[in-house]
Structure formats: C-alpha cells, structure tokens
Amino acid sequence: MALLTPLFAFLYHLPQVYKWLLKPYYIASLFMSIAFVMIRKMPGVCEHLSTQREDGNSCDFDWREVEILMFLSAIVMMKNRRAITIEQHVGNIILFCKVANVILFFRLDIRLGLLYLTLCIVFLMTCKPPLYMGPEYIKYFSDKTIDEELEKDHRVTWIVEFFANWSPECQSFASVYADLSLKYNCAGLKFGKVDIGRYGEVSKKYRVSTSPLSKQLPSLVLFQGGKEVMRRPQVDKKGRAVSWTFTEENIIREFNLNELYQKSKKLGKTKEKLERPSELVFSTVPEEEEPEAETISAMDTESKKDK
C-alpha cells in the first residue's frame, strides 16, 4: 500500500507535473537528483571511475551502490506515507535523492563528494521552491490589520493560517488552504493568512512559535466574535505541537466547515435584506396610496349627489 499511494497521487496530479517542467527550480532539482546515475552511466566518463565489481565494469553499479539506492527507495516510501500533496511527494523524493547522491559521491571519490555537497549548499541558498500562485479567497493580514479585521464584525467567523514562507510544510499546505477558501468563503465565513516569520509580534501575541523544533507551522486558528475558539495543531505543555495531518478532509471535519458554511450563508442573506437599495422601499409607496385615492374620489361623488 505504501508503494501504491505515491503512485496514485502522482497519476492524479499528472497534469500539474507538466507545469513544473517550466520552472527552473524543479529542472535543476531533477538533474541534481540523478547526478550520480548520469556520471556512472555516461560514456567517456564512467570508464575513469573506480568500482568494486568483480568484472571491473565501472559503468555499472556495484553491490554497495545498489544497497544504498534500495535503502533510499524504502525511506522515500515510508516518508511519503504522510505526504498530503504532490509537492510534498516530489519534495521528499528530491531531498532523499540528494542525500543518497552525497553518500555515493563521497564513497566514489572524496573530491566529487565535496563538489556535489558544495553545489547542494549553493542551490539551497539561492533557489527556493515556487510559491502557490493559484486562485484563492484569502485576506492577507499584517501586524496592524489582523486585530482590526477580527474585531470589525463579530458576526463573521474567521479561519486564519499562521505561516512562514521559509517553511516547506506551509508551502505544501498553500494549495490545500486555497481550495478550502474557494469552496467555503462567504459573507459570514472568511479565510485569512498572516506571515509570522515577518511579523514577530503577531507570533508572540497568538502564541504560535516559528521554531522548526516546535512543529507549529502551519497553524490554523478559528475565531468567532473576535476570540479564538480552537486551533490545529494543538500545543502540549512543553510548547510542542501535537501531531496532526493537514489534509482537506481533516480540516473540514475538525472545524465543522460544512455546518459553519450553512450558518454563514444565512448571515449573508440577512445582510442582503438589511442592505437593500432604497428604490425597493420607494416602490411600495404607490401601492399604499392607491386605496386612499379611490376613497377620496368616492367621497367626492357622494358629496356631489348630496348637492
């Protein structure tokens, strides 16, 4: 089952893979992930490499290299069992491929190992995964606007994500959160985000740690009447987050989004009734005046008869 899950996820999101091919980050990551295989199989280069094979064929993997690659495959499958999105699946594969490449290159030649490790460090410092740029109904807060928006209308329920741009978990969760905002956003239920990596005061006020060890990123907090009602993940006494998976199904269930959405839609309809244009009010005036006009004309005819 661990082998089929990433395969099905890859096939389901296959159309998105073509978009990645146009992004330099994934192209460079692909070449760095298969660097050792390319060098070991490249004609004109592989003949000059050392090998532990009995037949002396330096253009094929020896038994130790095969063991390392098999161990890598097992680690990737175990890690991907908890992956939510295709970005996380691909990110795990790229990460462990680079780790395996470092080990294989150092085992082959220490100079190649140092060169590859240097390339990985430079790549990590200069290239970042592309951010989610798809459609969404999300309001972005700053340290000055978040309190104002939460207190603006106590009838509005807010779901706010506390995130940091450098966090891989937040980057992977961005598309899931955007999809939820497209499905459930309405007049009485709104979605917001605040970058606590940028606004440290917000992080302290709402008790969301930016430390990677705390594992509190991302954090989803539900506000009703301007006050916090619940949050995920929960935090224990030591300040560490209780393990929780940020899937769309879990969020809908834990935050009762279907029920909140139905209640919020009723609030939106009430607002529309209260905010109707004045033209609708004026249109009722002639209907009320017509009976009065008929009464007046009837009284005039009666008075004429009396005369």
Curated annotation (Swiss-Prot):
Pfam families: Thioredoxin (PF00085). Disulfide bonds: none annotated. Residues 132-269 form the Thioredoxin domain. It is a single-pass type I membrane protein. Residues 133-307 are cytoplasmic. The chain crosses the membrane at residues 112-132. The keyword Metal-binding does not apply. It is found in: Endoplasmic reticulum membrane; Mitochondrion membrane. Residues 20-111 are extracellular. Residues 269-278 have a biased composition (Basic and acidic residues). A motif (Di-lysine motif) lies at residues 304-307. Monomer. Homodimer; disulfide-linked. Occurs in both reduced and oxidized monomeric form. Oxidative conditions increase homodimerization. Endoplasmic reticulum and mitochondria-associated protein that probably functions as a regulator of cellular redox state and thereby regulates protein post-translational modification, protein folding and mitochondrial activity. The thioredoxin domain lacks the 2 redox-active cysteines, suggesting that it lacks thioredoxin activity. The di-lysine motif confers endoplasmic reticulum localization for type I membrane proteins. This is Thioredoxin-related transmembrane protein 2-B.
